[in-house]
Amino acid sequence: AESACRIDRLRGEVLALLGRFDEAEEAFSQAKPPAEAAGLDDVIADILSNLADISLKRGDSDSSLNMHRKALELFISIGDAIGAARSYNNMGYILRRSGDKNKALEAYSEVENILAGDDSLDLIPAQIVLARALLDLGESDRARDHALSSYERSESGEDAILHARARAVLGRYYAKTGDADLALHHYTDALSTMGEAGDPLALVEVSILLGEVLQDSGRIEEALERYREALVISEANDLRMQIGELLARLGGVAPDRQRRMEYLQRALSVFRELGAQTRMREVQMMVHTAVMGR
């Protein structure tokens, strides 16, 4: 029963990555009772964390926040610093999205406390997420410290993808602070590493970031080209959430109104199919703006 529930959990994680939320939820629901019966707190915490992510994508942030809190309690009780840091990061994201900046910063401060007391390289992914979040919250100095730290600490490691992710967040810092050339340098290097490593999801994520910098620098044609390339990769790998995201980006920057509308309508149908309510509402606003001709 123990190995069966671990397999169901893994199946759920893969299905969630593919944007097949109903099937993922079913797999997690199958895994949960045997995990509870066997007292496997690590598995239960992971399941709660994954279910919370699905709830958020469906637009139910309250339920997502509650599940992340429950997962956090379990991670703390079993002394899992990586799980706890991930939970705090996720909670910070939800609080930030709902406009509660102070509470979000409190959650991110908890991640900083974990990092201060544990220099494990396994915490670098959480530090990268933290750096991005602090940048978005306007905490540039704190963000720079974590971006540089994760960049330096991952430099000598075996994990080329992790180092590329750290480079991407450093690129984001330079983009936010107005140094587009340095930003592009880090993003381009990160992309080539991810291309060589054959990680389509990471490749798409960094392509989106690179597109953002090009867009902000007024290089619209190049940004469109990046988004289109990333869309092809997403479609080839059935990354449905990313397909929707890229269609929405293309709908935001395409030069003529008809193309914008086409991209946005396609993005809407992808998000509707996925049940991603929050993104659907945001794209509907973009459609409204495009219709009004702004």
Model-identified regions with their sequence ranges:
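Flexible inter-repeat linkers and adjacent short helices
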Residues: 1-28, 32-40, 268, 276-294
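Residue-level detector of the short coil/turn that links helix A to helix B
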Residues: 19, 59, 79, 99, ...
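Amphipathic alpha-helical segments of tetratricopeptide repeats
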Residues: 29-40, 70-80, 109-119, 148-159, ...
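Eukaryotic tandem repeat interaction scaffolds
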Residues: 122-239, 243
